[in-house]
Each structure stands twice: as C-alpha cells, then as structure tokens.
Regions:
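Conserved loop-alpha-helix segment in the C-terminal half of the alpha/beta-hydrolase fold
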Residues: 198-238
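Active-site loop/oxyanion-hole signature of alpha/beta-hydrolase fold enzymes
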Residues: 33-72, 111-114, 252
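Conserved alpha/beta-hydrolase catalytic His-Asp/Glu region
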Residues: 130-186
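Flexible "cap/lid" loop of the alpha/beta hydrolase fold
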Residues: 95-135
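The conserved beta1-alpha1 loop
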Residues: 7-11, 74, 210
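Conserved HGGG/HGGXW glycine-rich cap/lid loop of the alpha/beta-hydrolase fold
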Residues: 2-44
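Catalytic histidine-centered segment of alpha/beta-hydrolase-like enzymes
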Residues: 238-248
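Conserved hydrolase catalytic core segment
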Residues: 68-110
C-alpha cells in the first residue's frame, strides 16, 4: 500500500531543504514532497495578498498528484495551503499549519491601513531583509555567520547546517542566498489583509500547531481562528521558527495531529 502524501510548503526565506531533518522523521510514515523554492518563478510574481503564490502552489499540486494530499506548511507555506484549500478542497485530505496564523479582522484592518499609508515596512521584517548580508566565501562561513544571529540561536545544529548547505548557492562572486532577500522582502510587504473573509469557507480537516513563544501568533490574535475557523489547536515549546528548532518534536506532533484529523 502506498504511503499518504505530505506536500510541504516552506516559510519565507527558508528553502524546503532547510527542513530535511524534519522530513527525515516523517518519511517512515509519509511520502514527503515539496516545491524547493516558492516565489521565484517569473510566472508567479509576488503580488499583494500572495494570490499568485497561491496559484503557484495550486498548479504544483494539480500537476503533481492524482490523489488527495496532506498540506503541511510553515508560516508563509501554511497560509498558502489554507488559501488553496479554500479554493480547491478536493486536492486535500487535510491541512496542518505550523505557526501560520490567520490574522483577525482587527489585525487585517491595521495591515490594510498601514499599507495604504505606506507605513507597513516600519512594522514588518522587510527593511532588514533587504539589507541582509548576502555574500560569503564558503558554506562554513555561511554557517558561522548565521550561528551568531539571535534569530537562529535556537536552531537545531543539523538544521542550521542544512540551511547553510541548501540555502546558499555558489556564484561567480562567492556564496549567495538561494532565496533572494529582495523577494523575501516583497513577500513580507505583500502580507494578505483579507483573510477574515474566508471564515466559514474552509471545508477540509485542519489543524494549527503553534509555538508557545511565537510573537507572530500573539500579534495575529489566535482568538479569531479559534472562534471562526474549524482548526484543531496544539502547541509546542518554541518560537515562530519551532519547526527548525525542534524538528523531531514537530514531526511527532504532525503525525499525532494527522491521526486525530483522520478519525
């Protein structure tokens, strides 16, 4: 009997192979597939609300599979699976969002106002992303550089090595980030502000796994999701980036949650 399929969608700035250690704990139970790098196909540019990125994921699923899949996505990737599942529920057995909060009506309104006023960059990671260092002389140098960064301090060491290995590519100048910082910044700037309109429209089994210390989830107000969307909720100790901090524990929770959704 063939394994059930997980199609994984990565977070902004972290190509899929950064999650190799997480995948290794899932592969006994599931076939794990992914698009290696979202948002870099000129056919699907970054637009406000991530609509073309949604289309990119939907086309990938329709082209690749002849049976329903389990959509697992971290942050950006989770929101994209949510958007596709609302539009094309027949593609999915279930979706599992990893710290990918569906922001509340109040938060959405704030995002829309800030975008209209041209002030959203002041409150998003976009500016620091655009000016991030993007040139090293070796992958060891990439690893050592990010190892010193607060954002990466809690990463599992193997995960960080995978990020250095697969998140940097050799060019004529040296090693540069595989996920272009300019595109990462555009994605932050294009954060959807219309997600509340989808309440009541999700028709597939769904779960949300969150980090206990996730600032992103706190700002998004999970109370909206609890009240208006049919998600099961579970939490794992860690930040917004907990799948990269605790890959084994994350895999165990994904397996447990999917079994519950399948009852």
């Amino acid at each position: 009997m063939s394994k059930q399929i997980i199609h994984f969608a990565h977070a902004n700035g972290f190509p899929a192979k950064t999650y190799n250690k997480l995948f290794s704990y899932l592969e006994d139970d599931f076939e794990v597939n992914y698009l290696e790098r979202h948002a870099h196909n000129p056919k699907f540019p970054v637009t406000d609300g991530w609509e073309r990125l949604r289309d990119e994921l939907r086309e990938e699923l329709e082209k690749r599979y002849t049976r329903k899949i389990i959509g697992v996505g971290h942050s950006l990737g989770g929101i994209l699976h949510f958007l596709v599942a609302v539009e094309k529920p027949d593609l999915y057995q279930a979706i599992i969002l990893l710290d990918a909060p569906i922001i509340s009506r109040l938060s959405s309104g704030g995002v829309k106002i800030l975008k209209t006023l041209g002030l959203f960059d002041r409150f998003s990671p976009s500016p620091m992303t655009r000016f991030r260092r993007n040139l090293w002389q070796s992958k060891d140098e990439v690893f050592e550089h990010f190892k010193q960064k607060e954002k990466f301090a809690a990463f599992d060491e193997d995960v960080l090595r995978d990020y250095a290995e697969h998140g940097a590519i050799e060019t004529e100048r040296g090693y540069e980030l595989f996920f272009k910082p300019s595109i990462e910044a555009k994605i932050y700037r294009a954060l959807p502000h219309n997600l509340p309109k989808f309440r009541g429209k999700l028709k597939v089994p769904a779960a949300y796994i969150g980090g206990t210390n996730s600032q992103e989830a706190r700002m998004a107000r999970l109370s909206f999701m609890r009240k208006h969307l049919p998600f099961e909720f579970q939490f794992l100790e860690g930040s917004h980036l907990f799948p990269l901090e605790k890959p084994q524990e994350t895999a165990e929770v994904i397996i447990t949650v999917f079994r519950r959704l399948s009852r």
